Amino acid sequence: MRAVVVTDQAVEVQDVKKPEPKPNEVLVQVRACGLNRADLMVAGGMAHGATGGAGTIVGMEFSGEVVGLGSEVKNFKEGDRVMCHGTESWADYAVADWGRTVKIPDTNMSFEQAATLPVSLYTMHNAIVTNGSLQSGETVLIQGASSGVGLMALQIAKLKGASLVIGSSTNEERRNKLAEFGADLAIDSRDTNWADQVLDATGGKGVDLIIDQLSGYVANDNLKATAIMGRIINVGRLGGFSGDFDFDLHAARRIHYIGVTFRTRSIDE
């Protein structure tokens, strides 16, 4: 089959062996692929988690039709239209574990539309709903809201009934567009008083939930901008893998600080 493969120089289309599904995997004939930040990193020769380097097939999200099933796969059959979060998807065929595979609606979603959803939708549903436990009427801040995953977060927060949705972006042009995706207030996380802006918008209380894709330089101000008994969900580290952290403020505000990733989750999870 054909696949887009990382080489020492760039990427190129090569003929490679068609994958065989493991017991917990579906084999999909790929109809459309997504393109996200991690794909660009891998295509550029960098690593994303355990993925990367010469010989790697690019691609993390895709859609298509199930053409093969592992022995442990549940709730899927050959011919199902699906979208998947997996690896090596810029190819004619790709595999994904059934826990990160979702059926596509038959009537109102194309393969192309579906291929844009897995990474952003799975990531932010897991962050906002499963771990963040956002309730109707609560307030939320999305750090890094102008990314594809961030834009999905804004929409999920609105759909779940958040009374105030704040989004951050360091790019003025992108920041000005956040309202189109559900942001009631847009802030610049490089502004030294952004946490005060959040406090002003919440009557001094702080937000109930922060979805943090930045970490690093915003860590302490996140604590300042979070309500007592609020939650911070650590999704990404675009602002740095380490930073100052005021443990006293964390304790005083009794903040629940939760890290999330799919890399250490079981198939059933």
Regions found by a protein language model. Name each.
Residues 76-77, 134, 226:
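Short, well-ordered loop/turn sites that connect or cap secondary structure elements
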Residues 83, 141, 187, 210-211, ...:
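N-terminal Rossmann-like NAD(P) cofactor-binding module of classical short-chain dehydrogenase/reductase
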Residues 86-99:
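A structural motif shared across PLP-dependent enzymes of the aminotransferase-like
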Residues 193-204:
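Short amphipathic alpha-helix with an adjacent loop that forms part of the alpha/beta core around
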Residues 217-269:
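Glycine-rich phosphate-binding loop and adjacent beta-alpha segment
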